[in-house]
Regions:
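Nucleotide-sugar donor-binding and catalytic loop/hinge architecture
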Residues: 1, 47, 186-200
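N-terminal strand-loop element at the rim of the active site
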Residues: 7-68
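A short, histidine- and acid-enriched strand-loop-helix "catalytic/donor-clamping" loop
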Residues: 9-14, 60-64, 105-134, 153, ...
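Nucleotide-sugar-dependent glycosyltransferase donor-binding/catalytic pocket residues
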Residues: 13, 62, 93, 184, ...
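Membrane-proximal helix-turn-helix segments that form the acceptor-binding/catalytic region
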Residues: 23-28, 74-77, 134-154
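Short His-centered aromatic/hydrophobic patch
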Residues: 90-96, 115
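A short, active-site helix/loop in glycosyltransferases that binds the activated sugar's phosphate group
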Residues: 141, 148-176, 183-186
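Conserved donor-binding/catalytic core segment of Leloir-type glycosyltransferases
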Residues: 181-183, 193-211, 216-217
């Protein structure tokens, strides 16, 4: 039996997007811990219902205070060390950066990261990036150059992302895998027949200019 630690931020991501992976690990007899920094009591109950063990920790997802992040990383490493896992799996930008560093401090044997996308700082904007966003991007790239080489494996979903991040900024990673789209569990998100005869158009994306919201409105 292995102990596997998942490090995310928003608690709902565990039961919305990681449930099948957690079920598969539990079925194989492994113990799964779900680290979340943004949660409610109801969220923690839903994680328990999956069969995973919820663990709360502190990490400001949008914070830019380096001292705060250093303290959070140290505290996170202590929590990881108490569990003594065989593997740490982080997803989302900040958990991949600080979760990886914390896992290495805790001497975890294997550390894996999943980047589902590079985020708005790496997205071309109709207008140039603001100076603040440019600064955030520089900080993010610097932190990636520190953290990503520590990973045993880095998984991407978008086949363009390895070039846009690793090649563009000369970041060395031990092993890279492009998984592609992870899809939906159709037993959970079941097909429903069209209940309206009217033709309608739906915009499924974040309300950002680079996602095409202006084109959709026009």
């Amino acid at each position: 039996m292995y102990k596997v630690v998942f490090i995310g931020t928003v608690a709902s991501s565990f039961y919305s997007f990681r449930a099948d992976l957690i079920y598969a690990l539990l079925k194989q007899g492994h113990e799964v811990y779900a680290f979340t920094s943004e949660y409610t009591a109801e969220d923690l109950k839903k994680i328990e219902h999956l069969g995973a063990i919820p663990v709360t920790y502190t990490l400001n997802r949008g914070g830019l205070n380096p001292l705060e992040d250093i303290v959070a990383t140290y505290q996170l490493s202590k929590k990881i060390k108490e569990i003594n896992p065989n593997l740490v799996f982080s997803y989302f930008s900040k958990p991949i950066i600080f979760g990886t560093l914390a896992a290495k401090l805790a001497k975890v044997p294997r550390v894996i990261g999943l980047l589902e996308g590079l985020g708005y700082t790496f997205t071309e904007q109709p207008e140039r990036l603001s100076k603040k966003i440019q600064l955030i991007k520089k900080i993010q790239v610097f932190l990636y150059t520190l953290a990503l080489p520590q990973l045993d494996q880095l998984i991407f979903l978008n086949p363009d992302d390895p070039h846009d991040l690793l090649d563009q900024y000369s970041i060395k990673v031990k092993k890279v895998e492009v998984l592609g789209g992870i899809g939906l569990n159709l037993n959970h998100y079941k097909f429903s027949t069209n209940f309206s005869s009217n033709i309608s158009f739906i915009f499924i994306a974040r309300l950002l200019a680079e996602k095409g919201i202006h084109d959709y409105i026009k």
